[in-house]
Amino acid sequence: MAEDGQRTGPGVVAVVALAGAVLLFLIAPVVIIVIVSFSGADYLSFPPPFLSLRWYQRFLGTPSWRQSIVVSAQVALLTMVFATVLGLLASLALVRGRFRGKGAIYAVLLSPMIVPTIITAIGLYFFFVRLKATGSILAMALGHTVLALPVVIIIMAATLQGFDIRLEQAALSLGASRVTALRRITLPLILPGVLSAALFAFLTSFDELLIPLFLSGVEVQTLTVRIWNSLVLEVDPTIAAVSSFLIGVTTVVLGASAFLRGRGESATGT
């Protein structure tokens, strides 16, 4: 036993070291951006010569940046509503339904996760150009829904599969209609999973660049498009502050989603 431990010891150390190196490689850019965002210098520098909030003040004090936050929030909220409703209906059909071609339909619904986003963006651009709808919040929200829907379906399908169907069957046996059982039994119990999926849809939209890059207009720009345009024209530490803001939003949303998923698993007993 001791010899086995000695033989496996170096392997375990190597795996842990490799995992730590990968984790550091992934986290280091984020940490650097956050630190640079507090720099008081007039240019991007790491480590910063001294700390200051001046770039956050410029970010939040510039009307164009604030407008981009509002546009991103509006698009993300619409995307969240569209993707959540469509994803819930699709998940119910895929999990509960018995019909031919269910696997093919499921594959088609998840295809936006496989197809390169640039191809999806180009297709959406030509579609909305024909409708003369580019540059609108609705067009960007519909485009983001295409990307968010697969994520929502995966989360909701997993939630429904973990739901004890006997609870709904008991309600039906007591005279409740399917709609009533769904509304008063199923939905309250899977609500944490639904909210978690909705948050992921919001985050998918809020962080997306390529689709709004094709569909946004001169006056209607999301925060990510505004960052891109600023990087093309000029680079100053304001970009680091904006990026840190996005990192903060992502962290909060992911934390809330993880909390809701934990509550959902407790409620469904999975």
Predicted regions and their residues:
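C-terminal transmembrane helix and the adjacent membrane-cytosol boundary/short C-terminal tail
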Residues: 2-17, 101, 157-168, 172, ...
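Interhelical loop and adjacent transmembrane-helix boundary motif
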Residues: 5-12, 41, 56-67, 206-256, ...
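Short membrane-interfacial helix/loop motifs at transmembrane-helix boundaries
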Residues: 28-63, 213-218, 270
